[in-house]
Amino acid sequence: MERNYQFRERLLEVHKKGLRDDAIWTKLTGTTVDESWEIVYPADADRVLLHAAHDLRDFFEVSMNLCLRARPRKDGEPLEGRITLTDAAHTPALAPAYTEPAAYKLDVGDGITVCGTTPRGTLQGCFYLERRMGIHRGPIIERGTVEKKPLFSPRMVHSGFGLDDFPDAHINAAAHMGMDALLVFTKDLNITPHGYLDFNNLIYRAAGMGMDVYAYSYYKSPKHPDDPDAPAFYESTYGNLFKNCPGLRGVTLVGESVEFPSRDPHTSGCLRLEKKPGETRPSPGWYPCYDYPEWINLVKGIIRKYKPDADFVFWTYNWGYVNEEARIALIETLPTDISLQVTYEMFEQFHPRPGVTV
């Protein structure tokens, strides 16, 4: 029987041991990597490209039982017999046609070249190479050219290791799964519901593995945007956060977590825990209030004063049960320079047979 939380040990295994099976991969055709090969990268590679090289080397050692050298590439060095990691800035001629930062192009011949639009794309290309070799159960890859880009971004994820607990190996594993952003519950600067967390350190560590960090707001929002002291209050919360942590990619706002004292008559007008006995109307966090756009514009303006390109994500699943007319009315009045996150089918009901509702 496992100990409590022993599953965490598996969550820290980025590369699976013993994937190589010579009885399987030797029957396939393609380019084979052996211990005469090297992994090379630009001499001025940034943290993400260096991480890509070292992660790929670890994959070959742990999963393929091969020990490859990783080193800076010399000018004019041939591509054959090497896995060359680069990006569009270093080798424009090898760049993918896509412009997305995480896009990449993989060329496989007598050598293997992975070129990303940015180093993040190169890293994702290395992950693709790892997945293909894992499927083949050996150090072999199909010859040819492959170009890929993410279907969408960001792909955010909470920690599966423990809420707001992000060991490096767990961040790396999430990146291997195609995630490109971490969500951290934020009650205040460097404070999560579970206590202190150095946000800037998390941002730094995540960035080195090609990941962004979003603040999932747990801030109290007791001020209506029309209150005279509302700007000063939200400056002391969201403004203080982005002033001190400009590396945050953005903020995610969910009704249940950021409810404010809306003046929409369809709601109680107060926070959930402040409801008076007998009040049957929903709290503002659970209704598409007409004044959410006012609140959003106030907070957004404060955040973007410190980070002009901050992604502002507004998530609407809390009022999915409300009639469509009210939900659409809110969407039509939201500012267009934010990201709207919706949860499809959450409140849909299906009737597979008479008397059964799911």
Show the residue positions of the predicted features.
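Acidic, contiguous N-terminal accessory segments
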Residues: 1-109, 139-142
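Second-shell loop/turn segments in exported
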Residues: 39-49, 115, 160, 285-288
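Solvent-exposed, polar/charged alpha-helical surfaces in well-ordered, non-transmembrane soluble domains
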Residues: 54, 58, 62, 124-127, ...
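Structured segments of extracytoplasmic/periplasmic soluble domains
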Residues: 55-67, 129-132, 185, 244, ...
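Conserved, mostly hydrophobic/aromatic
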Residues: 60, 118, 157, 174, ...
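Extended acidic/polar, glycine-enriched regions
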Residues: 75, 98, 105-149
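Catalytic-core regions of glycoside hydrolase
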Residues: 134-137, 158-160, 180, 186, ...
